[in-house]
């Protein structure tokens, strides 16, 4: 039964994104990685042959798909469809892991797949960064739950991929996770995970540096284009931010509504259960709520197309 649901979910997630990817386009954003993915096939590389401020991971993955299936619109959309299928199946599996009824898990995952990548249809940096961050969140939750080395190794890799998709919202998620892990370590007196996560992150950095060196990409070019220049954009957006009830609260009201059961359930436990802050459920709650607010903050600051309504079925499922 589980395998049948997974197969159905994969097919549905792929097909629904292929459908909406062919329904329409955004004049600039929809083509953002078509040209750059094709340029990699021609032997050019980001940071070296063309200026780029986000999305190198997306460009290389798109180049692979173009190589396998040809440089056409359907293989371009397939990129987003694959990510949609991966995060939808991952959502289904983690809900089952937390003993949610398999039918409810399937239902929430189907709704998730409709609200995830189909909002764009085509590969987009914000989506990739958010979804790889979500996969990292899943891995972290499982690391806390099962205490397996694999998950402690995996989540830094996923966060690194998220960051190389786009600096934000991944940076906000990274900061949130660091704060949670500091709290987790001090309260639970567990520090062993540090060596596994650090070695994982260090290995990823070394591989990226070796790859960049082979391709002739200068570290200075990467730092200038991907780290320093985008900070000027972010600083300007933050300085231009103006609080409005509609933009900050009203626009995300359905996400806040989905948060209410999870928030009050855990608030009740914090108040009435002695030592709840030592319980694993408390850290699941922290991870989910800080991930949610990281994405909301990102949407408020960037004021791009709203794409985070996939949080609604996810939050209800964990409530």
Give residue spans per PLM region.
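Specific aromatic-rich, kink-prone transmembrane helix
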Residues: 90-93, 129-146, 151-160, 178-184, ...
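Membrane-interface alpha helices of multi-pass inner-membrane proteins
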Residues: 151-169, 173-178, 206, 290-300
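Short acidic/glycine- and proline-prone juxtamembrane loop motifs at membrane-interface regions
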Residues: 119-129
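Perimembrane helix-loop-helix junctions
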Residues: 145, 172-205, 317
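Membrane-interface transmembrane helices that cradle and orient dolichyl/undecaprenyl
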Residues: 97-99, 136-154, 162, 255, ...
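Membrane-lumen/periplasm interface segments of specific transmembrane helices
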Residues: 194-237
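Extracytoplasmic catalytic/substrate-binding loops of multi-pass membrane glycan-assembly enzymes
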Residues: 21-36, 46-61, 71-74, 215, ...
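Transmembrane-helix signature of polytopic, membrane-embedded enzymes
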Residues: 91-114
């Amino acid at each position: 039964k589980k395998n049948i649901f997974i197969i159905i979910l994969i097919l549905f997630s792929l097909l629904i994104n292929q459908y909406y990817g062919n329904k329409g386009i955004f004049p600039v954003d929809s083509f953002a990685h078509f040209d750059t993915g094709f340029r990699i096939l021609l032997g050019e590389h980001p940071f070296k042959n063309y200026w780029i401020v986000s999305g190198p991971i997306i460009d290389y993955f798109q180049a692979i798909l173009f190589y396998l299936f040809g440089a056409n619109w359907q293989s371009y959309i397939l990129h987003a469809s694959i990510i949609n299928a991966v995060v939808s199946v991952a959502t289904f599996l983690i809900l089952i892991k937390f003993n949610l009824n398999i039918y409810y898990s399937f239902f929430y995952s189907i709704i998730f797949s409709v609200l995830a990548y189909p909002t764009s249809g085509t590969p987009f940096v914000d989506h990739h960064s958010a979804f790889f961050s979500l996969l990292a969140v899943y891995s972290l939750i499982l690391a806390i739950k099962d205490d397996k080395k694999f998950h402690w190794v995996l989540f830094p890799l996923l966060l690194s991929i998220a960051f190389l998709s786009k600096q934000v919202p991944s940076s906000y998620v990274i900061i949130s996770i660091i704060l949670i892990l500091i709290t987790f370590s001090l309260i639970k007196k567990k520090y062993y995970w540090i060596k596994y996560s650090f070695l994982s992150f260090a290995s990823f950095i070394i591989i990226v540096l070796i790859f960049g060196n082979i391709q002739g990409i200068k570290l200075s070019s990467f730092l200038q284009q991907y780290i320093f220049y985008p900070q000027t954009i972010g600083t300007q957006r933050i300085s231009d931010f103006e609080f409005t009830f509609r933009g900050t609260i009203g626009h995300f009201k359905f996400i806040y509504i989905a948060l209410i059961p999870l928030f009050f359930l855990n608030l009740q436990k914090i108040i009435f259960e002695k030592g709840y802050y030592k319980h694993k459920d408390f850290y699941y709650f922290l991870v989910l709520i800080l991930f949610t607010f990281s994405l909301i903050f990102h949407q408020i600051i960037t004021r791009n197309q709203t794409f985070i309504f996939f949080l609604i079925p996810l939050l209800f499922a964990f409530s």
